[in-house]
Amino acid sequence: MDYLVCLSLHARFAEIELDGAAPLATQLERKQAALTDLAERSRAVLARGNARWSRASAHLLGQSLYEFGDALLALEAPPSLSGDDALAYLEVLEDQAWQLYSRGESTWSELVRLAPSGDEDPDNWVSITKTELWPRIARRFLHLPELDYPLVQAEAPPWGS
């Protein structure tokens, strides 16, 4: 029953769009409050100790954190800002998005870590989470430059001939 409440809270959370129709601060407060409600209910599900619903709830919470981060990254700077001001605005949003991604990653990593090996996963929450988590983790490293490694001619050791 608690998980069904989590699903309805997630639906309410997802309905709150960051679209600029209302002041962004108001939209952010509403979305953050909805996320907090979802997190509290998810903690209640986890406290019950039922592995099946705990996994489902943890996955949903991690998904919500990622969705919030995605919504922040999709925002554009207000037309009243230009140049460095617009870049600074977008940088703040990006920093907040990466914090949400980090929390989502921690939630999902914990879900995967706590799943005992060989454990039955009847609803596939662990495998679903792994499938979605690994590409997310890889995205963190896309902006890092590739390192060039010098190539050195290898010589056969004297005892190898």
Residue ranges and their predicted role:
Residues 1-161:
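Acidic, polar-rich low-complexity tracts and alpha-helical solenoid repeat scaffolds
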